[in-house]
Amino acid sequence: MLVNLIESVYRLLWGDLFTIPLGGGIGISFMVVLLFTAGIWFTCRTRLLPVRLFRDMIAAVCEKKQGRNGLSSFQTLVISTATRVGMGNLVGVVAAVSAGGAGAVFWMWVTAILGASTSFIESTLAQKYRQPDPLYGGWRGGPAYYLHVLAERRRGKKLKRSVVAALFAVSGLICWCGISQVISNSVSSAFENAFHIPPLTTTLVLTAIAAVIVLRKNATVKSLDVMVPIMAVCYFVITVGIVLFNLPKLPAVFGRIFAEAFGLRQAVAGGFGAVLMNGVKRGLFSNEAGSGSAPCAAAAAECDDPVKMGFLQALGVLIDTVVICSCTAFLMLLVPQEITEGLAGMDLLQTALQYHLGGFGVVFIAATLALFSFSTFLGVLYYARGNVAYLCGDNWWSQTVYKLIALAMLVIGGMQAYTVVWDLGDVGIGLMTIFNMIALVPMAKEALAALNDYEKRKKLQ
């Protein structure tokens, strides 16, 4: 019954909202319309921010911590990158190419470029409306908190909780439980292929190690500080090396991506509509722009200007999808199609790495996925802190209960079917995006005003 409910909500969010009568019918989902419309609108309103202010985005990474509490700019980027560069860049890209073909990669790029401006708006608002965190110290915030501010303004009085803000918080907790399932499902599959270890064994070991880390107070950020830079550099160096070694094949890969992106070559069932939907869906899962996840980390940073935190998160979206997701996609697309035909999920990625690096490739991607999975799991639990506190108040029991639920979802995910696991995460992130947009549309003018003020001050320097 629960599976049927998840599938029904999934179809409502990601199923065809309408069909364009071209090439046998192009199905467009509600979420595709929402994300593209918002992305185009915010990109225009910020006057092509990702291009215009790219240098400022780079400079924001080097901002020094302004106080003793909270996170530095680098730590904030690390936490949001942990979830983006974690499962999204491996499992998300694999899922996009498996279901949408090579053309889905192009639509992931488009989603990221448009999403950078959306990420700027939501992260700037999160920084502006953050609150002190009495449990963990520092700051907390995110869409639940600026949705609460919006509700109080419209009602004209103080509220203990807002319905829409609570719905966002619940959707986020559902999404992050879904991501927990994707983590164990993918890692157990990878370890079974690489080392012939039974999925249940891998899942239980993964859960035990995760429990040791997450049930401690502030171990999450400390673990990510060390883990993310090392794993990201290792993965990036090896994948770029493979791409450079296969440089003569890249023009054909780009040709395939663009041909399948616009339906010039039929690659998957459902044609252009399936390519577009899977690219946007997995692009959102990978870079999180507009979903409201990354602002939960942005709110925790010590920063002298909310605009700089917006720059930081916009940069994270571009690093994630345009750079690292592309590397993962190229790993698979540089392999002859007859070798990967009929493969999906981690089987596809591991076969691709085996083609490029031999037996080492299978072991490398399994180990990398395990590290990425830990970073993602720790990252989403960090996101969950403020949302659990918004729903249940400032107490340790609610924080611990959610951590235990997330750990339980790790166990369940390792034994579930691949598609069912993805559907729960997609439902959660879809609902989060809808509730987040309810706040972003009317409150965007505040972030835009802050941006204009920043640019005026910059001219005077």
Region annotations inferred by a language model:
Residues 1-87, 97-104, 115, 439-461:
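N-terminal alpha-helical transmembrane segments of multi-pass membrane transport
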Residues 34-35, 42-58, 164, 172, ...:
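Membrane-interface loop-to-helix entry segments
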Residues 67-99, 125-128, 135-150, 167-170, ...:
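Alpha-helical membrane segments and immediately flanking helix-loop junctions
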